[in-house]
């Protein structure tokens, strides 16, 4: 129920008051939470907006005040520095915060992306077919892009000397980065599969003009975006965290069941959104980033403990972080919804 301002998402509807009237009975107190999103409102965080529109957070006794994010990799650090109750963003950035012993780092409580969404896009006719082919090439991306930030893991996994890859950063939009690559400005572009696909559609460029080197297969132990909460909230108000996780899970189930309703929820907040691009972006997210086969066994929200531990250890080694934290220090499974309530329908082969 929230719309974008320059700094904050405040409600397109009136924000719920501190006390909301029940259905003819006693008033229900609402807990207000400050939430940092991965970006502005889009199809890839629409489980929040659809959950708001359908009253899932209200039913859980919660009112969410949203703040626009600056990219998934910045969410964990900003949540720690700015005191957010809740954040949604990349779990690998959270690993970095915990590995550096940041006492204010949040903790993940619901794993949204059970695959890494990151890719390196290259022109369809490029000779780059494997990570080894990146040696001597120029790859460009946003400084805080998840693919760029986790590239050391990919390089280490494939014994590629990362220093042999020329990496530059740019503040240009993703559409400009990819079309610039196609014009010969660089050999590859860091990004998400879904984001690059949406950028191409928005720019009117055939998606077939690019190919992807997908981290999901090249660094299979890495996870992606997760719901995080402050450690103080988890410690002092665990019932609130349980309620939040249940409501978000209901939102994910609603999005998976009705993508059209999810896109409509986004459009109500971003009337100028490019609908075909956002539809493709959501489809890539649901079937790709949330489609790991383990989802059939675990459902969305949970992690495979051994895989998660391998992935965070690989990240810490590749980025020479001060320590390798225990998986439980990064992801707290105590707040998981019951297995029977988790969404397993997105799992791929």
Residue ranges and their predicted role:
Residues 1-17:
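N-terminal secretory signal peptides and thylakoid transit peptides that target proteins
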Residues 16, 26-27:
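Cleavable N-terminal signal peptides
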Residues 22-24:
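N-terminal signal peptide c-region/cleavage motif recognized by signal peptidases
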Residues 29-183, 187-194, 213-215, 220-221:
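Short, glycine-/small- and polar/acidic-enriched structural segments
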Residues 119-121, 226-229, 233:
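Short glycine- and hydrophobic/aromatic-rich loop-to-beta-strand nucleating segment
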Residues 197-216:
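Extracytoplasmic/periplasmic substrate-binding proteins
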Residues 236-318:
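Secondary-structure end/capping motifs
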Residues 308-349:
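Conserved C-terminal helix/tail region of periplasmic/extracytoplasmic solute-binding proteins
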């Amino acid at each position: 129920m929230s719309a974008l301002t320059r700094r904050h998402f405040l409600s397109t509807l009136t924000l719920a008051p501190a006390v909301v009237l029940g259905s003819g009975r006693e008033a229900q107190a609402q807990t207000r939470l400050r939430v940092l999103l991965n970006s502005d409102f889009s199809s890839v965080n629409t489980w929040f907006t659809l959950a708001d529109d359908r009253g899932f957070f209200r039913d859980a006794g919660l009112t969410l005040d949203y703040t626009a994010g600056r990219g998934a990799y910045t969410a964990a650090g900003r949540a720690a520095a700015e005191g957010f109750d809740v954040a949604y963003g990349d779990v690998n950035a959270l690993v970095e915060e915990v590995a550096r012993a940041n006492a204010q780092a949040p903790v993940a409580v619901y794993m949204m992306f059970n695959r890494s969404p990151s890719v390196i896009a290259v022109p369809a006719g490029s000779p780059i077919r494997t990570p080894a082919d990146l040696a001597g090439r120029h790859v460009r991306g946003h400084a805080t892009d998840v693919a760029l930030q986790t590239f050391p893991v990919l390089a280490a996994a494939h014994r590629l000397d990362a220093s042999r890859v020329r990496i530059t950063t740019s503040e240009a939009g993703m559409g400009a980065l990819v079309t610039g690559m196609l014009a010969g400005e660089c050999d590859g572009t860091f990004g998400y599969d879904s984001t690059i696909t949406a950028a191409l559609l928005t720019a009117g460029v055939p998606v077939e003009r690019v190919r992807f080197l997908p981290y999901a297969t090249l660094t299979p132990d890495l996870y992606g975006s997760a719901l995080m909460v402050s450690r103080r909230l988890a410690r002092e108000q665990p019932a609130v965290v349980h309620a939040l996780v249940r409501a978000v899970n209901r939102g994910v189930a609603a999005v998976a069941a009705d993508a059209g309703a999810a896109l409509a929820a986004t459009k109500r907040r971003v009337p100028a959104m490019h609908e075909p691009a956002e539809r493709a972006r959501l489809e890539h997210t649901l079937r790709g980033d949330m489609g790991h086969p383990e989802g059939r066994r675990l459902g969305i929200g949970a992690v495979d403990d051994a895989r998660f531990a391998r992935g965070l250890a690989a990240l810490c080694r590749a980025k020479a972080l001060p320590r390798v934290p225990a998986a439980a220090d990064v992801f707290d499974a105590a707040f998981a919804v019951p297995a029977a309530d988790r969404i397993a329908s997105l799992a791929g082969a």
